[in-house]
Amino acid sequence: MGVIEFLLALAQDMILAAIPAVGFAMVFNVPVQALRWCALLGSIGHGSRMILMTSGLNIEWSTFMASMLVGTIGIQWSRWYLAHPKVFTVAAVIPMFPGISAYTAMISAVKISQLGYSEPLMITLLTNFLTASSIVGALSVDLSIPGLWLYRKRPRV
């Protein structure tokens, strides 16, 4: 993949990630002034995950690092705009949720219950379930870690 193709794919990924970020921000009743920042943060998070995945990291670690970046930027923006960090961060990480792997795991579980046990279906179920669980765990933990680091009152040592 050439540089131009990569940059076009990255721009497309970031633009398409901004749409669900704004949509969920509207569902969560985020103030209108913060909608553009939710879109930008969702784009930054999804774009950084794509860059990390393109550089060779797997989706779990890429999501871990991208959501850490989203949490850190969200805390900084919350100080600038005098809002709670979750105003920016929760809607921004929604585009990184593992819909396809969770859906594939669910379909595999339904097929196992209908057709009976088979090893390929069980492998598909476990692989996709563990991938989805790891991604959701990374997203939930990494939204809280920057707050614990940056708002800590006592010394770290």
Swiss-Prot record:
One biological-process term from Gene Ontology?
A: succinate transport
Residue stretches spanning the membrane: 15-35, 50-70, 87-107, 121-141
GO cellular component terms, semicolon-separated: plasma membrane
Q: Where in the cell is it found?
A: Cell inner membrane
Q: Which domain of life is it from?
A: Bacteria
Which keywords does UniProt give here?
Cell inner membrane, Cell membrane, Membrane, Transmembrane, Transmembrane helix, Transport
Topology class, membrane: Multi-pass membrane protein
Describe the task this protein carries out. Answer: Involved in succinate export with YjjP. Both proteins are required for export.
Quaternary organization: The transporter is composed of YjjB and YjjP.
Protein family per UniProt: Belongs to the ThrE exporter (TC 2.A.79) family.
Output the HAMAP family linked to this UniProt entry: YjjB
Q: What is this protein called?
A: Probable succinate transporter subunit YjjB
Which organism was this protein described from? Shigella dysenteriae serotype 1 (strain Sd197)
Question: Lineage of the source organism?
Answer: Bacteria, Pseudomonadati, Pseudomonadota, Gammaproteobacteria, Enterobacterales
